[in-house]
Amino acid sequence: MMNLLFHRLKRPLAAAFVGASTTLAFAPYQLWPIAILSPAILLILLANQTPKRALWIGYAWGLGQFATGVSWVYVSISGFGGMPLIANLFLMGMLIAYLAVYSGLFAWLNNKFFPQFSLSKALLAAPALWLITDWLRGWVMTGFPWLWLGYSQIDAPLASFAPIGGVELLTLFVLISAGALAYAWIHKQWLMIIIPVVLMSAGFGIRQYDWVTPRPEDTTKVALIQGNVDQNLKWLPSQRWPTIMKYADLTRENWDADIIVWPEAAIPAFEVEVPSFLSNIDSAAKMNNSAIITGIVNQSEDRQFYNSILSLGVTPYGDYSFDMSERYHKHHLLPFGEFVPFEDILRPLAPFFNLPMSSFSRGAFVQPNIVANGMHMAPALCYEIIFNEQVRQNVTDETDFILTLSNDAWFGHSIGPLQHMEIARMRALELGKPLIRSTNNGLTAVTDYKGKIVEQVPQFETAVLRAELTPTDGTTPYRTFGTWPLYFWVALSLMLAWWLPRKKD
């Protein structure tokens, strides 16, 4: 009996272990070859298994990946959810169990429709199905496209392909490489190892090619204020003005910067509650030929709440006035943090489902760029930076920089903020635009148009990051075409993988 149980569980247990190791491919560890080896081993474990067995093996792999990869979510649940330990663990388990569904679905589809481990399955079907299930995870229930394998390649040779097809093209090449390794192992066709070698070599070969051209004559001095405000104290009425004045004092020391950036919701008040302060600092910025960008919470006349970005000082908007149409309003809201699905049912159950500021409304998917001191910035508030298509559609021909404001204080000393920064770097590389990332307690950083970090300040310190950023002219193929050519290839791959074995028969 025990032998039978062990026989049934050894592949799922091995898959869970391999899935758990995948987190090492991402920040802060960045052992990027693991992102290729992990799905390769998964494909080996799936070989010659029934669709039902494959589903559980793939599901176990996903349990391992997300148990380690999104462990940082537990920091927020336990620190701010107001629930007992058992409830925290249950919620975390539910999240991991849900996210693992997609790797289970991949494995089931892979073995149901392509039962033989042929070359077409390894190089065409498996990579295509992986991208489809990744896309589903990034779309269903507003989406959670975190830990896409392509992100792990930001400092690897494959990164050179990001301006061509985005992070999804990198994921495709990771899976093609994994499929080649798995095929080589199963069929002892060691020549197949040349496929990942060729892909890596091609990445090295094109890494020096610039899709965009820097404009050094428009180099801009920026100052990013990292306030390091305690999240537990931030919204207490007694802390409102100490927090606001902390940002104001640090700003006064940096009026020589062209653009000064405060993080997401830096001002712990509704905009309508602090008009005098905003008017005064708007005037001060104009007097110093500078501009200030800040995150702020807004309330419309019909009592809709928005997580917004406001630009003050030297802007095209004139003197400060409360005008909701001149703000950027966050579109992609964080589930449970900024909106609660099925809120009529969930809110009464536990404090976690009734957090402050968890009833926001959405802004439009595409909105005008933020303009400050003549520079145009495509904005993304916190979680939005992980949605590559939204960021892509908000970058225009006039865009100089990508701007992202965040508050990762919810996740403490976990790996979450480091993974978040890794994703933000990919947006800069994909779109050929320098990135400005201002946060409450880190990671506050700026990157060049290739996603390389130019300057950053330490986490968990009050600090000001000073840097000079050079905007770019031109565009990348990814910004022009998006991912539709890639998904055309995905559809073609599935058709070929289905047809080729039958042609031989």
Curated annotation (Swiss-Prot):
Query: Which Pfam families has this protein been placed in?
Result: CN_hydrolase, LNT_N
Where does the CN hydrolase domain lie? 225-471
Q: How does it sit in the membrane?
A: Multi-pass membrane protein
Listed Gene3D superfamilies = Carbon-nitrogen hydrolase
Active site located where? 264 (proton acceptor), 330, 382 (nucleophile)
The subcellular localization recorded is: Cell inner membrane
CDD domains reported in the protein's UniProt record: ALP_N-acyl_transferase
Family listed = Belongs to the CN hydrolase family. Apolipoprotein N-acyltransferase subfamily.
Q: What is this protein called?
A: Apolipoprotein N-acyltransferase
